[in-house]
């Protein structure tokens, strides 16, 4: 397809990033008309769509004003409605996600928020479009096929942070779009259930899906049951889940042989909680364990006696340990004294001092004589100390 995308990129750079609302809106109208005309004549190929999405990426990159960022994100998401064929709409979403994944490592922390918002607005536009089509299975499957190749995939080349962000906004945007039956919701979540059982995904992604998708569903159910018990009013509507079907799918995934024990335990924990939800019970309610046997007063008295005996044995062990340490130190001192006597290094009795130890006992150690302090020599010259007398270097007695 011979498309003059170079001229369109000039419009992106010069007009769409302009701070003047009139100029920006006029440029967007030109872009919309150009896409509509080109799409009616001949389909865009993937190369054209990738260049288009890259241009849109840098338009968002250059936009620094928050209000204009939100408006631009809505405009970019709304481009899905400009393409004439459903095939082009699906491929545009695919190219948008792939292009953003390539650029994601280069996004700094000051620009990250606006690109996270851009992803959300694109997903919102996509789900709104599907809701208008009553979530027809054949069309919905085409979009979910794209997601399974990008954001719900084991593909290492697709940015993992983008996969996490998509999982974190999925339930919110499905709820906002509305119009889904329980069966359709289960079909939308099935790729994520299968992904939990894939051994190739990282622990980071597994935990993200576990928390952002399935624990969120259970938390919503728990909050609903708590509100009903406390007589609070809850907003009607929102997506509904078939807890029994989701639990059954999780069980099939959990029994796969290649799963490690840690992940299998987490998946089976979800199975139990979804089963409780299907029976109308609070999945996150913790029940205090009740002992199987009832304890009598005699049992408590016996336990008290055993505790006293155990405490006394500990005291006896500590006492014996201190006695052994004392004997070892005494033998060490005797050995050192014998060695000094053999070498003729006897220490006079008047130079033996008694030092009180921490345990209250005293032991004899030799006194240490203090050396004579150094005296500063008067006058000029180098100081010397000979026998405690001060002398000047170069001066004779």
From Swiss-Prot:
Protein name listed in UniProt: Ribosomal RNA processing protein 1 homolog
GO biological process, one term: rRNA processing
Region (Disordered): 334-366
Bias-annotated ranges (Basic and acidic residues): 334-343
Domain of life the protein comes from: Eukaryota
Function: May be involved in the generation of 28S rRNA.
Gene Ontology cellular component annotations, sorted alphabetically: nucleus; preribosome, small subunit precursor
Classification via InterPro entries: RRP1
Keyword Signal listed: no
Provenance organism: Caenorhabditis elegans
Keywords: Nucleus, rRNA processing
Gene name in the database record: rrp-1
One Pfam family matching this protein: Nop52
Entry's family note: Belongs to the RRP1 family.
Subcellular location: Nucleus
């Amino acid at each position: 397809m011979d498309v003059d995308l170079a001229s369109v990129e000039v419009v992106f750079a010069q007009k769409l990033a302009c701070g003047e609302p009139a100029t920006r809106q006029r440029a967007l109208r030109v872009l919309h008309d150009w896409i509509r005309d080109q799409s009616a004549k001949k389909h865009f190929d993937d190369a054209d769509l990738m260049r288009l999405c890259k241009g849109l990426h840098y338009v968002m990159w250059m936009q620094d004003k928050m209000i204009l960022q939100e408006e631009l994100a809505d405009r970019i998401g709304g481009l899905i409605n400009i393409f004439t064929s459903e095939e082009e709409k699906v491929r545009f979403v695919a190219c948008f996600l792939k292009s953003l994944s390539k650029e994601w490592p280069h996004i700094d922390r000051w620009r990250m928020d606006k690109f996270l918002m851009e992803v959300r607005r694109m997903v919102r536009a996509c789900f709104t479009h599907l809701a208008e089509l009553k979530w027809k299975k054949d069309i919905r499957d085409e979009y979910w096929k794209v997601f399974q190749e990008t954001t719900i995939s084991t593909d290492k080349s697709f940015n993992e942070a983008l996969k996490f962000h998509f999982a974190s906004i999925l339930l919110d945007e499905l709820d906002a779009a509305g119009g889904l039956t329980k069966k359709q919701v289960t079909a939308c979540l099935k790729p994520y259930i299968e992904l939990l059982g894939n051994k190739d995904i990282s622990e980071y992604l597994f935990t993200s899906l576990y928390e952002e998708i399935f624990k969120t569903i259970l938390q919503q159910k728990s909050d609903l049951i708590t509100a009903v018990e406390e007589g609070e009013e809850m907003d009607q509507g929102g997506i509904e889940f078939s807890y029994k079907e989701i639990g059954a799918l999780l069980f099939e995934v959990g029994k796969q042989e290649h799963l490690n024990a840690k992940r299998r335990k987490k998946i089976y924990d979800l199975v139990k909680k979804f089963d409780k939800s299907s029976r109308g019970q609070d999945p996150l309610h913790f029940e205090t364990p009740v002992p199987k046997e009832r304890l009598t007063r005699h049992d408590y008295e016996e336990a008290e006696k055993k505790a006293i005996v155990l405490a006394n044995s500990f005291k006896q062990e500590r006492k014996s340990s201190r006695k052994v340490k004392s004997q070892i130190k005494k033998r060490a001192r005797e050995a050192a004294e014998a060695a000094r006597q053999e070498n003729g290094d006897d220490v006079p009795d008047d130079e033996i001092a008694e030092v009180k130890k921490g345990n209250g006992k005293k032991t004899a150690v030799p006194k240490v004589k203090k050396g004579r302090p150094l005296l500063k020599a008067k006058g000029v010259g180098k100081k010397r100390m000979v026998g405690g007398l001060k002398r000047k270097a170069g001066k004779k007695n």
